[in-house]
Amino acid sequence: MKLLVVIDMQNDFIDGSLGSDAAKAIVPNVVKKIEEASKDTVIIFTKDTHFSDYDCTLEGKLLPVKHCLYNSDGWCINDAVRSAWIKDGIIEVNDAEFREDNTIIKTTFGSTQLMNFLAREGHNFKEIEFCGLCTDICVVSNVLMARAALPDMRITGDSSFCAGTTPEAHNAALTVMRSCQINVI
């Protein structure tokens, strides 16, 4: 069995307050990845989630751009990505209420909930693949946490299924992943 972890494919990171052309460009790739996932692939999404106190958090002070505010349009998974998931019968139609076992709500870059899940259930998977946004922030954070939880697991990150805050930051994150024995393609 394989695990596909789709990191933060949310509106605010694609065409919202922190969106970019690079993020928009990977949407069709991520959609295709979900649609082509085999029946023995478990798909988990993460959703970056902030609240009205965002400005008071360290992230809010260092990145003063409100994004992914709980239950806002920017917080929702991109429609095309969501539709690929729904079409496969994996989730309920209501975006705000993804099935708990397939979505991880996280309030920071890396998810300890994902890491704990991997430490507990990782032995059930032959491989873990990551895709999503942003390569140099949330993707690399979660990939490295997965490596810590599962030091002997084959973990893959496909560079065409991720986008960074800049091309340079994207490439730097891929270099870090390779250094930590992540299969980067």
Give a label for each model feature:
Residues 143, 147-148:
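Surface-exposed amphipathic alpha-helices with a cationic face
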Residues 1-103, 126, 152-156, 165-179, ...:
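Active-site acidic carboxylates
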Residues 103-141, 163-185:
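Conserved N-terminal glycine/acidic-rich loop preference
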